[in-house]
Structure formats: C-alpha cells, structure tokens
A protein has these predicted regions:
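Acidic/histidine-rich
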Residues: 172-253
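Hydrophobic, aromatic-enriched interface-forming segments
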Residues: 116-205
Length: 288
C-alpha cells in the first residue's frame, strides 16, 4: 500500500512551526504508518541542526529526494497534481512517492477522499470547483493552542492532533479497502439488472461502481437495497460523483403506492418489502 522512502525504523522529520496545518499533520501521520518511530521537529526554518534530518516537509522551498533524505515543499513555484487542477502540497508529493502505483483503484479513491481535498484546503482552493468533498482534516487548525495556553505545550498538542488525524486516515483507508471489496458483488448484480433498476441483496457501497458503469448514460436509474431500519430503500443514481443531480426524480405520488412508508427529497423512497420496492421502481422508470 505504502512504502518507506528511507529504509529506517526510526526517522527524524522536520515540519514547520507555528499554526497547525492539515498538510504537515497528514505528512507525519502517513510516515507513522510505515516507520516504527517518527521524531517530529517543528521549526520556522531549516538550520544546521536540522538540515540532515531524514525528512524535511512543508518547509525549505525545495524538492530533493535521495535514498538518505527526502525534502518536499510546495511554497516554491506551484505545481499541479497530475491529471487535476489542484495544486500540490507536501502531503500530496509525499503520498505520490509512497503509494503503490500499481494499486490504481486504491490510489484513485484515496486521492478523491483525502489527498486532493487536503491539498486544495492547504492551497486555499475551493473544493466545489473541482468536485471534491471537503477535507476530512479541517479540524486540524482549530486544535491549536489559544494565546492564554502555555506555548511550551505546542509540540505536545501537535502530536495529539497527529494521532487524531491517524484515526481519520486509517478509517478512510479501511473504508476504501471495503469499498473495493464490494466492487465485484455490485458488478455481478448489474449483470442481472433489468429495466434500469438495480437490486442489491444487501447494502453495498455502490455509487462509484454504478456511475462508472453508466459512463454518462442512464443505464442504471434506480438502486434498491435493504435498509438498516428494516424494509427496502429506493435511491436515485447521481449523474456524476459528488453531484446531487440524478437521472430521474422520485415523485411525491410514490408515497401512495402499496408498501411505501414515505419518500425524501425526491431521491429516496422507503418500502416494506423488496417486491413492493421493485414494483414501484419499475413504475417510476416507466412514468419518468
């Protein structure tokens, strides 16, 4: 999944001092996934005491990677993350070098869920302009000490924030792995689909797989799956990832159909059985 760039169990890492940023916090969290010990040195500039550190990240205004040292920053001439209009940050540059390039699907999901949002946030770019979800690490800056706190505790607090970020990142990674595991099952269900209505025997993360299958065409229009509240849900299919625009709307009149307990936002309808849900979904598609 991720590889060490420096073959050591214990490494010294320099990041910038002052305010906490998701960029440098995420860098440390990522390194802690592959190194047993990560010693963090927070400085306002690289000096003779720190210039030989194993990693120098988000500070220094230079990129230089050797087998003994990794220096990555983004405050020099801006660079774009490949295939996007999002500017690089130190975390995106570090991830780019550490992630397994052959695990294409995992990389795609990780970039969409974590890397691109963190980079956009750090560079002051608007998430919505790029169809991105907000950064899952937006809490980082809010965790800094107040002016009345003992500033000697700043590094200790930084470590606490890194641990919080690690919990988030580990959960994102697990969610992605579980999502990838579901792809084959969703694909098999798509093969059996009839009339634009996809029926899942159990809830699975289906959105990405269905959007990819549709490829800009309304092949799958509605998805039915068991609800964790009992019964079955009908849900509309978004036209593209991160969009509320769908191929069709669920009309209010669906609430009058047999077995329906209600609908929400023209995007969901709730039924007591899969049979009633399928019957309703086919009617919705036919009448659209």
């Amino acid at each position: 999944m991720f590889k060490k760039l420096i073959n050591k169990n214990e490494v010294n890492v320099v990041v910038h001092g002052g305010c906490f940023h998701a960029d440098d916090v995420a860098c440390i969290a990522l390194l802690k996934l592959v190194h047993n010990e990560v010693n963090v040195i927070r400085k306002f500039k690289v000096d003779v005491d720190t210039e030989t550190a194993d990693y120098i990240l988000d500070i220094g205004r230079v990129d230089k990677v050797t087998e003994n040292q990794v220096i990555l920053d983004h405050h020099q001439t801006p660079e774009l993350i490949e295939g996007t209009e999002v500017k690089h940050c130190a975390f995106s540059k570090l991830t780019e070098r550490m992630i397994d390039p052959d695990n294409v699907l995992f990389k795609k999901h990780l970039y969409n869920a974590l890397v691109l949002p963190v980079a956009a946030q750090d560079n002051g770019q608007n998430y919505s302009e790029f169809g991105l979800v907000p950064s899952p690490l937006t809490f980082v800056n809010a965790m800094g000490l107040s002016w009345k706190d003992d500033q000697k505790l700043n590094d200790q607090r930084f470590g606490e924030v890194v641990n919080m970020a690690m919990m988030v990142i580990k959960n994102i990674i697990k969610t992605i792995e579980d999502k990838i595991e579901a792809v084959d099952e969703v694909t098999a269900a798509i093969r059996k689909m009839e009339g634009g209505v996809l029926v899942l025997d159990r809830y699975l993360p289906w959105v990405d797989s269905v959007i990819e299958y549709n490829n800009g065409e309304p092949k799958v229009k509605l998805v039915i799956y068991p609800s964790n509240r009992g019964g079955f849900n009908i849900q509309v299919v978004p036209i593209k990832g991160g969009s509320f625009e769908s191929w069709l709307k669920i009309p209010e009149e669906v609430a009058n159909l047999e077995g329906c307990s209600g609908q929400a936002h023209s995007a969901f309808a709730f039924f007591d059985s899969v049979e009633h849900a399928v019957e309703a979904a086919r009617k919705i598609v036919k009448d659209a």
